[in-house]
Amino acid sequence: GYDIANYRAIDPTFGQMEDFQALLKKAHDLDIKVMIDLVPCHTSDQHPWFQESRSSRDNPKRDYYVWRDGKNNSEPNNWRSLSGGSSWEFDERTGQFYLHSFLKTQPDLNWDNPEVRAEMKNIVRFWFDMGVDGMRVDAIWGISKDPDLKDDSPNPDFYGNPNDYGAFIHDHCKMGPHFQEYLQELASVCDEYDDKQMVFEFYPDDKLGDIYHQYSRILTAHPKASAFFMEYRDNEWHAKNIEKKIENYLQSANSTTPFFCIGNHDQPRVASRLGIERARALSFLNLLTPGISVVYYGDEIGMMNGELTANDIQDNFSPANSVVDSRDLERTPMQWNDSQFAGFSSVKPWLPVNDNHTKINVDSEKITNDSLLNMHRKLLKLRQTFPILKNGNLSIVQNTDNGFILGLKRELAGQRAYIFINFADAPQNFSTPENAKIITSTHSVDLITAENLQMIIPGYCGVLLIV
């Protein structure tokens, strides 16, 4: 899990440090970069820091975590854990509460303590010096909180259990007054190296304003630091909606390397939440935007949420082993082939293999010309063939004559590339640039009609043109 007991070691469950170093060397021999997760906002309650911190109120590590007295015979404030219930846990040994934004076994670090910030920067240096190429910084929003521990405001749009995380607007428990300062301090470690990258995990929160604009100053100062574009998780399927969010993100990211992704380990599979054809269109878009295109394992073959029972659930973040709320649905084993355990393992894996692995798997998609996997391969090859698809600037094509069509333009050294995506389920007609040549599409090019600067493309279809 994400309860770190030692920031400088490999959990023995997964091997030894020598195993990781061998993996790192092999990856570098193959010209593959390796990024690892950094979880900077909390540790395990088994971490030596916390064991010392909870031992007494005057321990030197006490201020490494957030400890407070109760208020009116209750918790210090109304903050809620992401897993539900109070964010505070009473510790009888010292008679105070400690803060945990996640599970009670994951106490929050106190980033207002400069010693904690120095420790975290040294941890980053430890892995960078070993040869790790970058860090994905998890749940970064928790590094700064309201110093006065003000109560969070009630969420007027929430009608569920008042103990749920969503019952409040999280206007004081995260992204506090030192958020930008601490982000900048952590990102500054990248400046000490020539070839390291840091990417932050942010989830947009409309109730807290524009997150991307809030960190844009930091990332401009540290172009080796960036943040994921997570807006594709929004199920509002509309061309103008996506257009606005892409434009907003690129303006905020400025000189940094964009990280676009359509799915991850915390969200339902894109093929499950949007359908396979929409997932195909988004994958096409994702691989043709600037910067780094992040593909969550299995999305390249259209993997769907697993079909699990309550007894299958391993994720203790899910309330009462709720299947509906479980993140395990999107974490089932990779489907390599149609064998019993999908080629992932020779024994029963941690989570059950999806029954549809007999049809949706890598081996079958390799030999299917128009498969989602082969579309990914084709686009990745095109990114290597055409520098414009890797390094070209991106702008919005404002006049596609059609509200269902998302139009993007890439430009580099006098060359132009156009990406058009049909967000409707029916064929759409729109104007095309003069002298544009069709390079590829989500589906067979034979399905696309182009004549007299007009093009008709099928529903949920994308097309790449180059002038």
What are these regions (language model features)?
Residues 1, 42-49, 143-146, 206-210, ...:
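Short catalytic/ligand-binding loop motif for oxyanion handling, primarily in non-cytosolic enzymes
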Residues 426-445:
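Beta-strand-rich binding/interaction modules
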Residues 1-125, 129, 141-206, 334, ...:
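Acidic/aromatic-lined carbohydrate-recognition and catalytic surfaces
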Residues 449-467:
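C-terminal beta-strand-rich structural cap/linker in extracellular carbohydrate-active enzymes
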